[in-house]
Amino acid sequence: MIAEVGGNQMSTALPDWSYPGPPGGWTADMLDHLPPGAPRHVELIDGSLIMLSPQSAFRMLMLRLLERELDPPDDLVVARQMSVTLGLRQRPEPDILLVKRTAMTSLATTSFRPEDVHLIVEVVSPESAERDRTTKPIKYSNAGIRFLWRIEQEDEAPVVYTFELEPAVRAYVPTGIHRKRLRTSIGFEVDVDLDLGRLIS
């Protein structure tokens, strides 16, 4: 049996609930009703379940840094590892989101609507590279999400690629490549020291 885990196809024994899937295939709302033994973090891309791979130290530190350093205005909230429902068979789980405070309607919220998302951040790993660089940006831009950051590891340090939506064609245009320091504007000014060493010193 073939499973997709972290973007790689692997021969593995899948649990009964995951294969062949429900009649008609997986839909976004079904992720809220997976059995207790299912992984905590699962994405739905084009109707396929993606089991997210184990977290690296780089990704953990990068998410911690952004959670700590992003200082959005009062009408926006930083959310970590929450999904966004883009369509019937599309429910990716970005690493970081900035969402409207009004979207936090309940502590039971498990997913956001694209119109409530201001910024998406994806931290690239070897397993997720193709999805993070190609597949997901197209889906995010088609959904009208205005800002996207893609973070890569380069020589043990982060590089942040920033993008803004060109609304007429629903495509992202690059606005910068940031090393050592992230300075950009996403409706408010962002200035973040990208030195991860200060988080563990």
PLM feature segments, named:
Residues 1-201:
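Gly/Pro/Ser/Thr-rich low-complexity, intrinsically disordered segments predominantly at protein N-termini
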